[in-house]
Amino acid sequence: MDEKDLATQQAQAGQDPRLPGPDEDQERAEGAEAQAAEGAPPPHRVIPPHPGLRQDGGPGKPPRPSLRWDGGPGKAFPKPADGATYAKEAAEKGMTPPQLGAGQAGGPGKPPHPGPDRDGGSKASRASSPKKAGGKGLVSLKGDRAFQRLKKGRSGRGRLVLVRWLPRQEGVAVGIVVSKKVGKAVVRNKVRRRIREILRRLHLPPADLLVIAQPEAKDAGFAELARDLFLALKKSGLVQ
């Protein structure tokens, strides 16, 4: 072995194995140049958020609805317009607005439709109607003179009630007499309420009417009392 070969072997033995050799450096340089020529690798695709939606799902995931309407964070849903504003905007856009319900404005220049109150009638008709006592179309017969006059009226008797009546111009004025012979206050009130309810369901002509409950009425049911009262009214000639 000559001195030249010995020097070459010593140089190779003393080289650090962690350092790249000249061939590796050349390959890396060529790879970097090729990559630069081809361009940078494409990035991950991100789905753009839809207007009015907030992107929370991350790359490649569908957007998640936001609780806030479009225009950016911090803008709440638009407030609904009232009937008049909606009708005006619809007319400007050539749209036919839906029929407005009771109590809503009928559009520009139109008065609002009166809405029903809790008992089913309008407030205007309720204010103009006369005050009723008890059942529908019935008013209370008041004053001793009115009761005294009915002694001369036409009468009809049943097993449970006695009726007397006189004609009047309009409406039905009713007096109901339930004595202590019928029972205690609770029983008397029950009989009185039943008689008034029966009269409310009948279509009576205008009259001053007196109904006197008999002691047997305390044990009668509603249907039995209704039949007996109708029979007494028929006997008196008030109903046919």
From Swiss-Prot:
GO biological process assignments: tRNA 5'-leader removal
Lineage top rank: taxon: Bacteria
Note: The open reading frame (ORF) for this protein entirely encompasses the ORF for the 50S ribosomal protein L34 (rpmH). The two start codons are separated by four nucleotides.
Assembly notes: Consists of a catalytic RNA component (M1 or rnpB) and a protein subunit.
Encoding gene, per UniProt annotation: rnpA
Low complexity compositional bias, start-end: 122-132
Cited InterPro entries: Ribosomal_Su5_D2-typ_SF, Ribsml_uS5_D2-typ_fold_subgr, RNase_P, RNase_P_CS
One Pfam family linked to the record: Ribonuclease_P
Record-linked PROSITE patterns: RIBONUCLEASE_P
Sequence similarity: Belongs to the RnpA family.
Segments for region (Insert): 47-123
Sequence segments annotated as region (Disordered): 1-140
Reaction catalyzed: Endonucleolytic cleavage of RNA, removing 5'-extranucleotides from tRNA precursor
Keywords: Endonuclease, Hydrolase, Nuclease, RNA-binding, tRNA processing
Enzyme class per UniProt: hydrolase
GO CC, one annotated term: ribonuclease P complex
Protein name from the UniProt record: Ribonuclease P protein component
